[in-house]
Amino acid sequence: MIASHLLAYFFTELNHDQVQKVDQYLYHMRLSDETLLEISKRFRKEMEKGLGATTHPTAAVKMLPTFVRSTPDGTEHGEFLALDLGGTNFRVLWVKVTDNGLQKVEMENQIYAIPEDIMRGSGTQLFDHIAECLANFMDKLQIKDKKLPLGFTFSFPCHQTKLDESFLVSWTKGFKSSGVEGRDVVALIRKAIQRRGDFDIDIVAVVNDTVGTMMTCGYDDHNCEIGLIVGTGSNACYMEEMRHIDMVEGDEGRMCINMEWGAFGDDGSLNDIRTEFDQEIDMGSLNPGKQLFEKMISGMYMGELVRLILVKMAKEELLFGGKLSPELLNTGRFETKDISDIEGEKDGIRKAREVLMRLGLDPTQEDCVATHRICQIVSTRSASLCAATLAAVLQRIKENKGEERLRSTIGVDGSVYKKHPHFAKRLHKTVRRLVPGCDVRFLRSEDGSGKGAAMVTAVAYRLADQHRARQKTLEHLQLSHDQLLEVKRRMKVEMERGLSKETHASAPVKMLPTYVCATPDGTEKGDFLALDLGGTNFRVLLVRVRNGKWGGVEMHNKIYAIPQEVMHGTGDELFDHIVQCIADFLEYMGMKGVSLPLGFTFSFPCQQNSLDESILLKWTKGFKASGCEGEDVVTLLKEAIHRREEFDLDVVAVVNDTVGTMMTCGFEDPHCEVGLIVGTGSNACYMEEMRNVELVEGEEGRMCVNMEWGAFGDNGCLDDFRTEFDVAVDELSLNPGKQRFEKMISGMYLGEIVRNILIDFTKRGLLFRGRISERLKTRGIFETKFLSQIESDCLALLQVRAILQHLGLESTCDDSIIVKEVCTVVARRAAQLCGAGMAAVVDRIRENRGLDALKVTVGVDGTLYKLHPHFAKVMHETVKDLAPKCDVSFLQSEDGSGKGAALITAVACRIREAGQR
């Protein structure tokens, strides 16, 4: 018993000594985590070089765009063919994908050989052979009469210019077909099919095996955004942000990058890591100086590395008693499969002996232990190097997404990964050690790259179908020049109807006289109070106008909230609240009890009977205070002031915000004769000739007309321009059938239009993978400020996703692009409609004055105009386009409509004083 224990101990010690001896000898092949992180850092730099326009030509790691812009989302369906060519055999596959709530893939495939003489013959022979095999396969399945889409996996270095156009850079893996390098392989295969003439197919996509692997796994796991192959060769691909890919135009979305990482180190960046054995392998290879990283890690070279180490150690008399056999000296005799077999056993001694004896050697126990250890070191180094480069890719994706922790899946294929007993486990452990901030899942691709090519094709078909469906919906919101001219024409007709005594009562565009007959002339002076009520907040202002235009205007103001219960209570409660706030403001300014002239900006539809008498026609913007509609708001305000008995005010003028805006800008620019607001609501005013204002007596001079253009279309005159989404938003609003034009252009409604379109797209499976979240069903979540943020040019899709996440909408990159597109279309239409209305106004002023050309300024205010990144520009372009005889300038009103009310009061006081004199 003791003897056997001693013997076991002796062998263990012997084994241990032998292992240590090999470890020392191969010290440079054993890489620490520190070294691996350094390699990872270098690889990151190489990736950036490959992506940059200026550095790409000289970069070793080519980072080739694949034009694959999306991974599967599980809704793909249809029948597809795939060709998988990447070695001496190639496969033809028929893939049927069904999506009836259960993702299901059916496959038929057949393997065809490529004879050596065809591999080395002409390109025509090669592609004719492929077409023949394809015909044979389609015959068997009896599908020759169908024109099916085909995906082509072509695993050779290519320069891809489109999804279905790929130029072979150079043959590898023993292929030498003449006349193919530098040519588009898709065109060559199409020609071969045409030469036969007995079937037709639609070649949609050409991809390499790495991309195929990512797509195959992406169908089962939607987090899969990296593809890895470690087999005869090695390569990886991953989804990169378009904004970083300089070789392809466009910044939106993502694209899969075929890294061609086998060439890492070809520029010398791994020279300190490569050993004498790596150099020897390279010198004896078919492509010296090329694919140096691949030669350190892939199955084609691993066995050869072990053989070279065994030879050198034998020559130095460290193994086999210094004896060599002819077989051991023969290149390629030690195969990668042998490494897997030897490492597959616990101690590997029996298998090592078998392999070494096959090579004509007579190994001792120590020789077998050493061989086992050499295999371990070579395969572990391979897994570690793979892990280092993968860590760089994961780190990059994590930074691209700006996530604290990245959840990502890597789709993997290749004989080394699948067949080596420990490679996968070592790779996983090392990756997780090197990037602790990532939760990485490795998913084996079971059906290889052929199914992946079919998936790329299926995704391309899905994207094209979905794109067509979305465009069909969105085209109703995209207005042509002629359509916009028609909107302008109709607006002019409605303006006429509102101004005319006969038609005014039934006209939706009310064209209300404001009794403001002059703009500032610069001689106004004095202290004025202004009230500005037009939304859930209102302002009280003290405006000090110094004599002369350059004396300027000094302003003090305070903002007060109007609680919802007051908005929806009685009129007395609302006006008592307003007076309470005025009292607070006067006290705050140290002016308690002072009597001042007051201008009141009241931004609701009113019928004005004089400058200081204005009858509220109807509440808008969510107000519902009872007992106000049909009443004079100045009287309601005065009554509330008397109820308080604390101060008295001289209410000189009541105006709406649009007029206030025109007056504010008129103080700066004498050409300003139009006011426009595009914010929560929308409206416009302008200086009309008195002779046309039939509701007011007098023919001389001009008067500002408050158009109340939000109601344009309430008589059905815009019905052919309204979409189902406009109708839905209108029906669910507080005032169905009213303010239809406003509901197509103003900030209060654009987000709702977008939300309704997104719901429609989701129901039809064109967005958010067809899943409608409860959040998306919630009215009002899509605030217009989000539209402004989403469309901001400096915002990457990443931030768009963050906004959508904040709204509780889990979105992919593709979803973010679609949401952004919808926002763009809706906001653009709003700006164009607004521009068409404005063109009608300025053209009317020009025609009123009988001018060939008019120079006019529009004073503008409102959050949509000011904050949306493109609204103003699109609107300006539209006005220029539709009213070419008018030179229109736009002046932003900086101090809002409150200052305008004070200026109107100042002008009125000036005119009143002049009259008294």
Swiss-Prot record:
State the SUPFAM superfamilies in the record: Actin-like ATPase domain
The entry marks the following residues as binding ATP 1, namely R30, D84, L85, G86, G87, T88, N89, K425, R426
Annotated CDD domains: ASKHA_NBD_HK2_meta_rpt1, ASKHA_NBD_HK2_meta_rpt2
The GO terms this record gives for MF are:
ATP binding; D-glucose binding; fructokinase activity; glucokinase activity; hexokinase activity
Q: Which domain of life is it from?
A: Eukaryota
Q: Where does D-glucose 6-phosphate 2 bind?
A: D532, L533, G534, G535, T536, D657, T680, D861, G862, T863, S897
Stretch list, region Hexokinase small subdomain 1: 73-207
Q: Does the UniProt entry include the keyword Coiled coil?
A: no
- The UniProt annotation puts the region (Mitochondrial-binding peptide (MBP)) at 1-16
Give the record's membrane topology: Peripheral membrane protein
Binding-site list for D-glucose 1? S155, F156, T172, K173, N208, D209, N235, E260, Q291, L292, F293, E294
Which interval of the chain is the signal sequence? none
- InterPro entries reported for this sequence: ATPase_NBD, Hexokinase, Hexokinase_BS, Hexokinase_C, Hexokinase_N
The UniProt annotation puts the region (Hexokinase small subdomain 2) at 521-655
Which residues take part in binding ATP 2? 532-537, 680, 747-748, 784-788, 863-867
Q: What is known of its domains?
A: The N- and C-terminal halves of the protein contain a hexokinase domain. In contrast to hexokinase-1 and -3 (HK1 and HK3, respectively), both hexokinase domains display catalytic activity. The region connecting the two hexokinase domains is required for the catalytic activity of the N-terminal hexokinase domain. The N-terminal half regulates stability of the whole enzyme.
State the name under which the record lists this protein: Hexokinase-2
Organism annotation: Homo sapiens (Human)
